[in-house]
Amino acid sequence: MQEHPSISKATVDRLPRYYRCLRQLSDEGVSIASSEELGRRLSINPEQIRKDLTAFGQFGKKGVGYYVAELKESIGGILGLDQHLSLAIVGMGHLGAALANYQGIERLGFRLAAIFDSNPVVIGTRVGERRVEDIAYLAEIVAERSIQIGVIAVPAAHAQHVADQLVAAGISGIWNFAPVKLHVPPSVPFVSEDLSV
């Protein structure tokens, strides 16, 4: 994400919500949306939306609204979504396979660079354009393909070991889908998804 040191964390935290709403409006064929429409959809005061967006530049026209495609592209740029991060999925169970087959992954700002598993039955099979690699070669492939994000989709009992392998391989961040709390160095950004709720 671009640096804007004078902008509040609360404003920055709302940007992904604005982006998702604009993407939905775009998918619905809406070309112009007012701050009132955005506010209604997001349950955010329209004045707050105008204030948040003004912090990043001039968007929209008074009395007209915001051009959805233009604002979506601008917020995507601020969030860094115009730069696809390469990711590797570790674990080809049901969840890993679903993530690997998800067609919208590039819309989220990611590029699937590798898939890993330890099961000999799965290694060598294909998921879309990608071949499932042996996790024994994780460090080598992460370096070769400049992989930035490691996605953990393994059972809880194996998740910490996989996290350790990803960190040792030099991964920049971890996205954990295993239902367990993991310990990673503070220098490695870490997001954990709890799918049980």
Each predicted region: which residue ranges?
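Glycine-rich Rossmann-fold phosphate-binding loop(s) that bind the pyrophosphate
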Residues: M92
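HTH-adjacent hinge/linker in prokaryotic transcriptional regulators
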Residues: I32, E36, R41-S86
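Extreme N-terminal segment that seeds HTH/winged-HTH DNA-binding domains in transcriptional regulators
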Residues: M1-S31
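Phosphate-bearing ligand-interacting subdomains
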Residues: R23-S26, T125-V197
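NAD(P)-binding Rossmann-fold cofactor-contacting core
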Residues: E106-R130
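Hydrophobic/small residue at the entry helix of a nucleotide-binding pocket
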Residues: L95
